Amino acid sequence: MSSDQVLERFMKNGLMNAELKEFFEKALVNEGFSTMELRMQETPIKIILKVAKPHEAIGEKKFRLRQFQHLAAQRLEVPDESVEIVVEKVHEKGLCALIQANFIREKILGGVQYRRAVNMALKTARHAKAQGCQIIVSGKLKGQRAKSVKFQDGVLIHSGDAVKDYINTGYATVETKQGVIGIQVRIMLPYDPEGVLGPNYPLPDRITILEPSEIQ
C-alpha cells in the first residue's frame, strides 16, 4: 500500500469517526452521551458508547440498539452483522464535561437562570472529586449585548502533556429568544491509580513523602 493510499484511508477513517460521534452525540443527548470509541481493526467492527442511561440508550428489546447498528453499518459501508455496538454506563457523570454542558443546556431551556444552572454543575463536579471545573457561558445572557461569563471552581492545568488526559472538555448550545448561547465545560479529572475515574499516573509536580520505614 502506497503512502498516498495510507493517508487516504487514515483520513476516511477519521471522517467516519467524526460523523458517527456527531450522530450519537445528537441521538443520545437525553441519555447522557459521554464518549464514543470506534475500533475499525476488530472483527466485527466495534463501537463502544458510554452514556449515563444505558437502558434508555439500548431501548426495549434492544430496538434502538439495532437501529443504531443498521445506521452505523450503512455509514461504514458494511453489512449489519459486521458492526457490534457496546453500550457502557459512565462511571461518574459529574466528571464528564459533555454531560454537564448538556445538563446546563436543559436547565436553561427549562427556564432556570444560567448562573444557578452553572453553580449546580460546579457542585456536581466538586462532589464527583474533580480537581477543578471551569464553565464559560457566551451569548446574549442578559440584554441585547453578547458577552462571555467565566465560572471556575478548584484548579485546572492549561499546558503540558498531562492536559490531554487530565482535562475533559464538552460543548453545548442553547437556542433562546435572544439568540444562541454557547456553553463550554472543562473538568480536571482526579488522579486514580486504578485508571477508572481519571488518569492512573500522577502529575509531574505531585510529591509523595514516604515514611522512614518505607525507605530502603
From Swiss-Prot:
The GO annotation for biological process reads: translation
* Keyword terms of this UniProt record: Ribonucleoprotein, Ribosomal protein, RNA-binding
List the Gene Ontology MF annotations in alphabetical order: RNA binding; structural constituent of ribosome
Q: Does the entry feature the keyword Protein biosynthesis, yes or no?
A: no
Say which domain of life the source belongs to.
Eukaryota
Query: Its GO CC terms?
Result: cytosolic small ribosomal subunit; nucleus
Matching entries from Pfam families are given as:
Ribosomal_S3_C
List each copy of the KH type-2 domain by range.
Answer: 20-91
**Known InterPro entries for this protein?**
KH_dom-like_a/b, KH_sf_prok-type, Ribosomal_S3_C_sf, Ribosomal_uS3_C, Ribosomal_uS3_CS, Ribosomal_uS3_euk/arc
Q: Which PANTHER family match?
A: 30S/40S RIBOSOMAL PROTEIN S3, SMALL RIBOSOMAL SUBUNIT PROTEIN US3
Stated family: Belongs to the universal ribosomal protein uS3 family.
What is the official name of this protein in its record?
Small ribosomal subunit protein uS3
Q: What species is given as this protein's source?
A: Encephalitozoon cuniculi (strain GB-M1) (Microsporidian parasite)
Gene label: RPS3
